[in-house]
């Protein structure tokens, strides 16, 4: 069972983005390079869900 919150679209920027990645990825960790095109464009400039964030987990 997946909560509705995980599917909600949000703008994730800066520290909020990193916190959300920690939450979603847990011990797997994640690949985060703020200068690289990708997660910031997908999740800060336009809304994305926690499902989208999970694509950036290791």
From Swiss-Prot:
UniProt xrefs under Pfam families: Insulin
InterPro entries referenced in this protein's UniProt entry, alphabetically: Insulin, Insulin-like, Insulin-like_sf, Insulin_CS, Insulin_family
GO CC field: extracellular space
SMART domains: IlGF
Cysteines joined through disulfide linkages: 13-44, 25-57, 43-48
Compartment list: Secreted
Chief site of localization: secreted
Similarity field: Belongs to the insulin family.
Record protein name field: Insulin-1
Organism of this sequence: Huso dauricus (Kaluga sturgeon)
